């Protein structure tokens, strides 16, 4: 059985650039998996994916021409049903064998060869046979069809085939199919195309057309030499990155300054999907456009033209940019000039928007927010702005008195005003960023301007937090208003659905409270955020489920940071109000877990909790010394009298490790108490006193964390 390398290529019209990378990876993976499942390729087969604007291809090593035959065990029926007392086949067995294609003449010999095996209930007859292995043509036909059906296609096209009658659905019209097993064409067909050994190279620069492959292994090299195509997405991407660095260095030499292209992985992926043979060129625009905020210029060059703007060593935008061209003419001046002409109107538009926007102050735009609908149940952006401002003022007053309250309120009022500017209307990604520029232009303090930009932060996992306290307050207010508002009208995330990004908002609140160690109790924050909604029709207070939601997100975030589920549960189950304390509590729990006494105390705490849960009425942590009769309960009480003040003092100062470690002295008296003392004494007074002693022990053990959660 011969094994050779396999090459499959589907030649198509230009594929969607933002989807190309995933399409290429999915096509090769699905194709190879199907071949492996069919027994045509070993599990160790090497797979190489190729993807360019006009082709999807896969190279798979060690593919067999025919899959090995597979032993098949067909369970027939119990021996008692299939054979009579003399060992002859019953009519039921003969009928079953006939269904398997075994005629009456051959049945006798087959019956004699049937295998008997006990299936745990009875002896059963099995018919063992060999299933003929699929040929490569059969297996590859199914593999290609399955791979195409499984592609993550953003939107399909329906197009007519050359016969003028048939039509097929695919992401783009397909015009060629290559299927080579070594040097042999595999006779498969898909999308109205029969496989061959020919494809087409670069639309303009191929030196040979069509490109003909003698065997599967010369695919990439032959496409590169004859077709002027770098077929590998990864190799083409690396080549573009290399050329970008080289062109930036060349541009820097011409100006006497070190220049670098912007670092944008998504843009690099996109341009890789737009070209088959990259050629990076240097363009420039007029210096006057640099008066526009560089975020605007960079965005318009990236989003509209797919250019890489060049920055100087300080990160400041220069008037030079890099173009990733798909052609390499001897004289590139026409290509460069064309790109410079195309980008100029884009930059002129940005300058026009910037100049026009600055003719009106941010404050004068605020009134316009009352005409913008935020949510049909929560009113306009103007009403939302008023709620955010009220929440920001209250938080600011809690953290920094009247001065911070005024600054936070002012920033909150202006935070959404840039939504009504021309620049943000054209580029929504610049909301907040443009607000900062316009606030500075209006003469507002830097901390107010920074807060206008930063109140959206953190926008995503790993994003930076607001740079100042005013921005932090407004960002908290903005996210809390969203959370409280959406929960109050029943818009709670379910499963994968989270259209208002409430999980992200919750994590933002958690990060700002924890990483800034803000002295803001969570319950009080939620009550503060709910207050401005009192006049909203149909709003229902939802602080309790929202708190559950936030603590749940907190627990998930902590587990992702590497804390164990037990450590997280021990701390979060106590629902600490100051989230800034949580890292210290977790560190304390981890240190406590390393003590030799920890396991016994955790188990004892769990036992105490279970005892107290069974009591109908709440137990007060009150002990009458006169009712302490047993030596063990007296010893436990004395230990608590000594340990509790130490643990409390450490807890109050925030030394949670010391507070928990003080509990180690309780192990011996706790063990003795449970060995020697009957908690549920017949005397009600004794029983109540012992329960009070346990309640006191339970309270002491659970100040920092519920250490019972550490019990296995």
Curated annotation (Swiss-Prot):
Recorded catalytic activity of this chain's protein: tRNA(Gly) + glycine + ATP = glycyl-tRNA(Gly) + AMP + diphosphate
Enzyme type, top EC level: ligase
Record's GO cellular component terms: cytosol
InterPro entries: DALR_anticod-bd, Gly-tRNA-synth_bsu, Gly-tRNA-synth_heterodimer
Keywords, ordered alphabetically: Aminoacyl-tRNA synthetase, ATP-binding, Cytoplasm, Ligase, Nucleotide-binding, Protein biosynthesis
HAMAP family: Gly_tRNA_synth_beta
Subunit structure: Tetramer of two alpha and two beta subunits.
Record's protein name: Glycine--tRNA ligase beta subunit
Organism from which the protein derives: Dechloromonas aromatica (strain RCB)
Lineage: Bacteria, Pseudomonadati, Pseudomonadota, Betaproteobacteria, Rhodocyclales
Name of the gene this protein is made from: glyS
């Amino acid at each position: 059985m011969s094994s050779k390398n396999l090459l499959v290529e589907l030649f198509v019209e230009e594929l969607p650039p933002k989807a190309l990378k995933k399409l290429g990876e999915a096509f090769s993976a699905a194709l190879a998996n199907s071949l492996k499942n069919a027994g045509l390729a070993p599990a160790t087969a090497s797979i190489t994916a190729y993807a360019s604007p006009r082709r999807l291809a896969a190279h798979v090593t060690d593919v067999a021409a025919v899959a090995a035959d597979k032993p098949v065990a067909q369970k027939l029926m119990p021996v008692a049903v299939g054979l009579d007392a003399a060992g002859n086949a019953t009519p039921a067995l003969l009928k079953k064998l006939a269904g398997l294609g075994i005629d009456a003449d051959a049945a006798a010999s087959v019956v004699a060869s049937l295998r008997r095996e006990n299936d745990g209930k009875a002896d059963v007859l099995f018919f063992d046979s060999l299933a003929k292995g699929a040929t490569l043509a059969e297996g590859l036909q199914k593999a290609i069809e399955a791979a195409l059906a499984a592609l993550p296609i953003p939107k399909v096209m329906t197009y007519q085939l050359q016969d003028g009658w048939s039509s097929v659905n695919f992401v783009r019209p397909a015009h060629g199919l290559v299927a080579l097993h070594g040097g042999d064409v595999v006779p498969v067909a898909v999308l109205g195309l029969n496989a061959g050994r020919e494809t087409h190279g670069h639309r303009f620069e191929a030196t040979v057309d069509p490109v003909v492959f003698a065997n599967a292994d010369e695919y990439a090299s032959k496409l590169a030499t004859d077709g002027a195509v770098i077929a590998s997405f990864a190799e083409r991407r690396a080549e573009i990155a290399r050329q970008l660095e080289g062109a930036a260095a060349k541009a820097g030499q011409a100006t006497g300054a070190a220049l670098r292209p912007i670092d944008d992985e998504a843009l690099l992926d996109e341009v890789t999907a737009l070209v088959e043979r990259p050629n990076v060129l240097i363009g420039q625009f007029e210096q006057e456009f640099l008066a526009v905020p560089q975020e605007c210029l960079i965005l318009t060059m990236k989003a509209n033209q797919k250019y890489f703007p060049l920055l100087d060593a300080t990160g400041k935008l220069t008037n030079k940019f890099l173009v990733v061209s798909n052609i390499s003419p001897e004289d590139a001046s026409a290509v460069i000039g064309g790109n410079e002409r195309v980008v100029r109107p884009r930059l002129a538009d940005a300058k026009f928007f910037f100049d026009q926007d600055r003719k009106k102050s941010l404050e004068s735009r605020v009134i316009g927010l009352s005409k913008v609908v935020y949510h049909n149940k929560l009113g306009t952006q103007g009403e939302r702005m008023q709620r955010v401002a009220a929440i920001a003022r209250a938080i600011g007053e809690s953290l920094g008195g009247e001065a911070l309250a005024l600054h936070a309120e002012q920033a909150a009022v202006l935070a959404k005003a840039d939504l009504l500017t021309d620049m943000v209307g054209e580029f929504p990604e610049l909301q907040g960023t443009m607000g900062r520029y316009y606030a500075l232009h209006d003469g507002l303090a830097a901390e107010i301007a920074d807060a206008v930009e930063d109140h959206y932060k953190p926008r995503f996992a790993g994003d930076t937090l607001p740079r100042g306290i005013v921005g932090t307050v407004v960002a908290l207010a903005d996210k809390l208003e969203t959370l409280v508002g959406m929960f109050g009208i029943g818009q709670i995330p379910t499963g994968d659905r989270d259209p208002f990004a409430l999980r992200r908002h919750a994590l933002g609140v958690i990060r700002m409270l924890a990483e800034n160690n803000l002295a803001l109790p969570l319950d009080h924050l939620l009550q503060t955020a709910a207050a401005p909604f009192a006049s909203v029709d149909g709003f229902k207070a939802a602080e309790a489920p929202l708190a559950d939601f936030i603590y749940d997100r907190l627990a998930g975030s902590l587990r992702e940071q590497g804390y164990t589920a037990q450590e997280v549960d021990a701390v979060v189950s106590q629902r600490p109000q100051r989230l800034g304390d949580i890292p210290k509590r977790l560190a304390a729990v981890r240190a406590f877990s390393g003590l030799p006494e920890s396991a016994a105390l955790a188990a004892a705490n769990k036992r105490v909790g279970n005892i107290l849960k069974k009591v109908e009425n709440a137990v007060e942590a009150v002990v009458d010394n006169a009712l302490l009769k047993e030596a063990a309960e007296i010893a436990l009480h004395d230990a608590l009298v000594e340990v509790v003040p130490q643990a409390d003092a450490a807890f109050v100062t925030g030394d949670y490790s010391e507070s928990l470690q003080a509990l180690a002295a309780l192990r011996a008296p706790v063990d003795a108490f449970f060995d020697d003392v009957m908690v549920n004494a017949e005397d009600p007074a004794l029983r109540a006193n012992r329960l009070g002693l346990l309640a006191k022990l339970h309270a002491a053990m659970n100040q920092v964390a519920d250490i019972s959660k550490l019990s296995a």
